[in-house]
Amino acid sequence: MSELTEAEKRRLLRERRQKKFSNGGASSRLNKITGQASSHLNAESPLDAPSAAKATPPASVHSATPDIKEDSNVAPQLDLLKQLAAMQGQGTGKSTPQDSSTPDLLSLLSSMNTGMPSAEGTPSFGQAAPAAPINQAALDYHDYLLNRLKAWTILVKWVFFLLPYLYLITRPNSSVWPAYAFTQSAWFAPLRNPSNFTRIFATFEFLSISIYYQLLKNVEHKSKIKNLQDTNKLVKLVSLVPEGVIPVANLKGKLITLLQYWDLLSMLITDISFVLIVLGLLTYL
């Protein structure tokens, strides 16, 4: 038999050591080296562990499964809350008032809907809540107050100022005026002069329209209804148009301002028409 080479000797020695370690000799040798043969610490060598422990179960795959199931259960939970809210709304008229400590499901749902994104993709959180619809009886009462204000304004202007003033400038020497002592005073003399008609009429219209506007604000404060924002159909139609469709900034506010000026201008046009008609009648009579 030929002698073994150095490489073969080292290989045989390595194989014997490996076989010895696989039979449990690694732990006893480790205890001898470290002097912990009688210690209670775990001194088991990793070489003694079975090779089957190398395969670990795919725990990461199963750990993500509950999250997917949890997301799929969100919609049924919302439906359940809505059903409970509907049952609560039906039972409010039959049951006693609930305790203040009990959470209101309707308030909970409204707060959840507030944080949800709108149809345009932007979150609706922080947006102003839509105004409650105005009672029809309140609208009728507001229209009644507004019509009464306009009627009294026109009556006072026409009967107590415009008609007497137009009669004065067209009949300055009438026998009616000497019966009143104030018509003979010095401050009344400019009213008799027809050349002052434009200045006097413009001053009167400015004062009367200013007073009417203030009284209109008092009517809005009394009825809690804004004259144009809540009653005008054109303003309601413009408010339905989304922002950006029409390239005009604050279209609703500008329309309200324009309608306010038109309301005052229409009163001025009405008074001018009345003056022209009365002047024509007094001139040819």
From Swiss-Prot:
Pfam family, one: GET2
Region feature (Disordered): 1-71
Alphabetically ordered keywords of this record: Acetylation, Endoplasmic reticulum, ER-Golgi transport, Glycoprotein, Golgi apparatus, Membrane, Phosphoprotein, Transmembrane, Transmembrane helix, Transport
Biased composition range(s): Low complexity: 49-60
Phosphoserine found at: S45
Comp. bias regions, Basic residues: 11-20
Compositional bias annotation for Basic and acidic residues: 1-10
Membrane topology classification: Multi-pass membrane protein
InterPro entries tied to this protein: GET2, Get2/sif1
Subcellular localization(s) per the UniProt record: Endoplasmic reticulum membrane; Golgi apparatus membrane
Modified residues (N-acetylserine): S2
Record: glycosylation sites: N173, N196
Segments in the Lumenal topological domain: 170-196, 285
Transmembrane segments: 149-169, 197-216, 264-284
Gene Ontology cellular component annotations, sorted alphabetically: endoplasmic reticulum membrane; GET complex; Golgi membrane
GO biological process, one term: retrograde vesicle-mediated transport, Golgi to endoplasmic reticulum
Polar residues bias spans: 24-42
Protein function: Required for the post-translational delivery of tail-anchored (TA) proteins to the endoplasmic reticulum. Together with GET1, acts as a membrane receptor for soluble GET3, which recognizes and selectively binds the transmembrane domain of TA proteins in the cytosol. The GET complex cooperates with the HDEL receptor ERD2 to mediate the ATP-dependent retrieval of resident ER proteins that contain a C-terminal H-D-E-L retention signal from the Golgi to the ER. Involved in DNA replication and DNA damage response and also in cell wall function.
Name of the protein this chain belongs to: Golgi to ER traffic protein 2
Organism in which the protein naturally occurs: Saccharomyces cerevisiae (strain YJM789) (Baker's yeast)
